[in-house]
């Protein structure tokens, strides 16, 4: 009986040893990918979501890393707050000054440029204030005229990167917009574009989201190509000290992937076929 038990024990130990060897003999990349599997929470702007960019990129990220990215699309201010509260692993946002403050405060590990597009002023196709004719590349002049004429303007009003840019532009104008003409929506970019369309109002939008929705809107680009309208996006892994549950390895994997040659090439191609030009221009440091 003792001999039988000894034989059974030996067989079991041999089986375990063979299993371990099999795991070690797996292709190196496959083992690493299995270890990396899991999920991350990506807090990002509504513009990267509404434009369709993330639907285009993230399946490739998951395919390459085995990591699923769960997206929370909010304004940049809310995304940064999620990072501060330890409720996101990595951020993809577009308000560089606020992002740099976030990192300087120790809430993020580092910030790196990913891509850019630009902001535009859009409005009714008939352009009641004739801004496109008179001020096609002067956003400060256009906002001043909108305020003077008390013409309906829709603000994001959500502490997003777009909202922060709009407020900075009003500061340059020297005006604090208020009154019935100025509508603070507290909504994402897609919803605000729909509101501007329905109310025949002007609004500031990022070019990518506007182009992705243009076919369903009665809005035209009114002011563009002003240096004040540059729109840079950055990636920030959240400091894992903010929350013990933060997936620091997954966040680092996303940062490295979004800055990689493959991802940068994908970003540069997105929108070319449908719109004749990319919705975002990759500019990660080489």
Swiss-Prot record:
Signal peptide: 1-20
Entry keywords, A to Z: Cell membrane, Lipoprotein, Membrane, Palmitate, Signal, Transport, Tungsten
Domain of life (superkingdom): Bacteria
UniProt keyword Lipoprotein present: yes
Protein role: Part of an ABC transporter complex involved in tungstate uptake. Specifically binds tungstate.
Alphabetical list of PANTHER family matching this protein: EXTRACELLULAR TUNGSTATE BINDING PROTEIN
Lipidation (N-palmitoyl cysteine): 21
Entry GO terms, CC: plasma membrane
Encoding gene (name): tupA
The protein, known as: Tungstate-binding protein TupA
Gene3D superfamilies with a match to the protein in the record: Periplasmic binding protein-like II
Residues lipid-modified (S-diacylglycerol cysteine): 21
Disulfide bond entries: none
Subunit details: Monomer. The complex is composed of two ATP-binding proteins (TupC), two transmembrane proteins (TupB) and a solute-binding protein (TupA).
Protein topology in the membrane: Lipid-anchor
Location within or outside the cell: Cell membrane
One Pfam family in the UniProt entry: PBP_like_2
Keyword Signal: yes
Principal place of residence: membrane
């Amino acid at each position: 009986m003792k001999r039988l038990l000894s034989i059974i024990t030996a067989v079991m130990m041999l089986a375990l040893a063979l299993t371990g060897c099999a795991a070690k003999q797996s292709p190196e990349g496959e083992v690493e990918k299995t270890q990396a599997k899991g999920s991350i929470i990506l807090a990002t702007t509504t513009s990267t979501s509404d434009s369709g960019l993330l639907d285009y990129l993230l399946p490739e990220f998951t395919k390459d890393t085995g990591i699923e990215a769960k997206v929370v699309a909010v304004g940049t201010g809310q995304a940064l707050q999620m990072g501060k509260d330890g409720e996101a692993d990595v951020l993809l946002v577009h308000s560089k000054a606020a992002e740099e403050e976030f990192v300087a405060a120790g809430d993020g590990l580092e910030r790196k440029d990913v891509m850019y597009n630009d902001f535009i002023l859009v409005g009714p196709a008939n352009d009641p204030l004739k801004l496109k004719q008179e001020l096609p590349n002067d956003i400060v002049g256009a906002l001043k005229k909108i305020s003077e004429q008390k013409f309906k303007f829709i603000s994001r009003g959500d502490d997003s990167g777009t909202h922060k840019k709009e407020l900075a532009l009003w500061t340059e104008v020297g005006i604090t917009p208020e009154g019935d003409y100025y509508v603070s929506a507290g909504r994402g970019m897609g919803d605000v574009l729909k509101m501007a369309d329905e109310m025949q109002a002007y609004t500031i939008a990022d070019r990518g989201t506007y182009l992705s929705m243009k076919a369903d809107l009665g809005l035209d680009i009114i002011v563009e190509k002003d240096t004040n309208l540059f729109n840079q996006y950055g990636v920030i892994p959240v400091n894992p000290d903010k929350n013990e549950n933060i997936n620091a390895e997954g966040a680092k994997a996303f940062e490295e992937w979004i800055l990689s040659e493959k991802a940068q090439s994908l970003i540069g191609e997105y929108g070319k076929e449908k719109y004749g030009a990319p919705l975002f221009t990759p500019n990660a440091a080489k």
